[in-house]
From Swiss-Prot:
One of the record's GO molecular function terms: small ribosomal subunit rRNA binding
Annotated function: Binds together with bS18 to 16S ribosomal RNA.
Protein name listed in UniProt: Small ribosomal subunit protein bS6
UniProt entry keywords in alphabetical sequence: Ribonucleoprotein, Ribosomal protein, RNA-binding, rRNA-binding
Region of interest (Disordered), residue spans: 99-135
Lineage of the species this protein comes from: Bacteria, Pseudomonadati, Pseudomonadota, Alphaproteobacteria, Hyphomicrobiales
Chain's gene name: rpsF
Length: 135
């Protein structure tokens, strides 16, 4: 069996639970045809570089797959039919990456930076309030 990285973009109107349902549907297709789904990264709702079918945002999902070519062909066929899928892309790879993708690492880093920013702002506000009280 070959190793693949597969990414799909789901419409912005779709609820996050429906994205998970789409993912489980395509996992079922892969497993039915004798493949295995590895790591799954849901990047959430992100802006698109350009509009696709009147959508400015989409849910991004990255999946590592170990499956025969027939399983990939069937999954892509079903994605073509589904109106909730805006785009998909499957790439054959030599090996799967063990660590998180660069995009997910970037999202995590930004999330932590946002928390640090909030922490650094709150003492400043407290100091400013304390200074106002003293005067």
């Amino acid at each position: 069996m070959a190793l693949y990285e597969h990414m799909f973009l789901a419409r912005q109107d779709v609820a996050p639970q429906q994205v998970d349902e789409l993912l489980s549907l395509y996992k079922g297709v892969i497993e039915t045809h004798g493949g295995k789904v590895g790591r799954v990264e849901n990047w959430g709702l992100r802006p698109l570089a350009y509009r696709i079918r009147k959508n400015r945002k989409a849910y991004y999902v990255l999946v590592n797959i170990d499956a025969p070519a027939a399983a990939i062909a069937e999954m892509e066929r079903q994605m073509r039919i589904n109106e909730d899928i805006l785009r998909y892309m499957t790439i054959r790879v030599e090996k799967h990456e063990k660590e998180k993708s660069a995009m997910l690492s970037h999202l995590d880093r930004n999330a932590h930076a946002g928390q640090d920013e909030e922490r650094s702002r709150s003492p400043r506000r407290q100091r400013e309030n304390a200074i106002e009280r003293v005067e």
